[in-house]
Amino acid sequence: MSSLSSSLAFVFPGQGAQAVGMLAELAAAHAVVRATFDEAAQGAGVDLWQLSQHGPAEQLDRTENTQPALLAASVAVWRVWQQLGGTQPAQLSGHSLGEYSALVCAGALSLHDAAALVAERGRLMQSAVPAGVGAMAAIIGGDDAQIAAVCAEVAQGQVVAPANFNAPGQLVISGHAEAVDRVLAKLTGMGVKQAIKLAVSVPSHCGLMREAADRLGERMATMRWQVPTIPVVQNADARTYHTVAEICRALQRQLYQPVRWTECVRVLAAGGATRVAECGPGKVLSGLLKRIDKTLATHAIGTPAELDAARAEWA
């Protein structure tokens, strides 16, 4: 039986962490990886392992495929950690889609149901806004309050607002494409370090997703939920909830409200976390963690070498 550590937290990545070939090395060493993908595929209705290993990338990057594939990947890494007797974290959190991975690992929802749910989430998000109508942009080196004020100033009746508070000085905005362009033009004129439109087809975490969130809530209501066995810090309010109804409402709101990632990480730290493992493919969150709180010891654990290093250091 592995021990519980109050100083250990796990975080789970969102869209953008996917890559063709992800977890191939881990799957070669641990049969549970492929089994986890196959289990998720039953819920999603897509051969997630084939898609993850062979692509093509443009199919893997379709949000209705990306979401269940990343969910499967993160849960697979978690299960490997469990099989190896890794120390149990006292807190979990996930970035956007990663919140669903965290809830599965905390026992709130089965992997099968979660895979079906996030595939539907992807379809609802994709169909919520016609192609070309929405956009997202990353802004590096700006002040959060100033950027929010510019969004309000240039909206002109359209939707544009902060979508991801990823780290200090690292913000993503989302909304109508024309309004996003106006914000970028204004910020560039104000001397913001970097402002780049993202190659995404869906303007996530803004008011354009409210109808999709309503329909997502209807789908959630058909599924079996449990109270998590490990606290999950949720994005919408950077806090944990202790009833199924509150958890589901927070998941709905997450679709049209910003991901408060900086605050989520600070809540983990305030709750006693000094070590944080990134549970899934890639190292996107590890980079953000270092920008948010340099005192946190971080490890990605998506490869055998990374797992060995984390277990050796954190045994």
Describe these PLM feature segments.
Residues 2-147, 194, 198, 275-308:
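FabD-like malonyl-/acyl-CoA
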Residues 15-17, 42-44, 106-257:
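Alpha/beta catalytic cores of group-transfer enzymes, especially the acyltransferase/condensing modules
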Residues 69-76, 253-261:
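A short, flexible low-complexity segment enriched in Lys/Arg and Gly/Pro that occurs
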Residues 82, 188, 269-272:
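Non-catalytic positions within long, well-ordered alpha-helices that form the structural scaffold/packing
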Residues 179-180, 272, 304-305, 309-315:
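NAD(P)-dependent dehydrogenase/reductase Rossmann-like domain
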Residues 233, 252, 265-269, 286, ...:
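Generic hydrophobic alpha-helical scaffold/packing signal
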Residues 256-273:
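A short, acidic, amphipathic alpha-helical segment used as a generic capping/interface helix at domain edges
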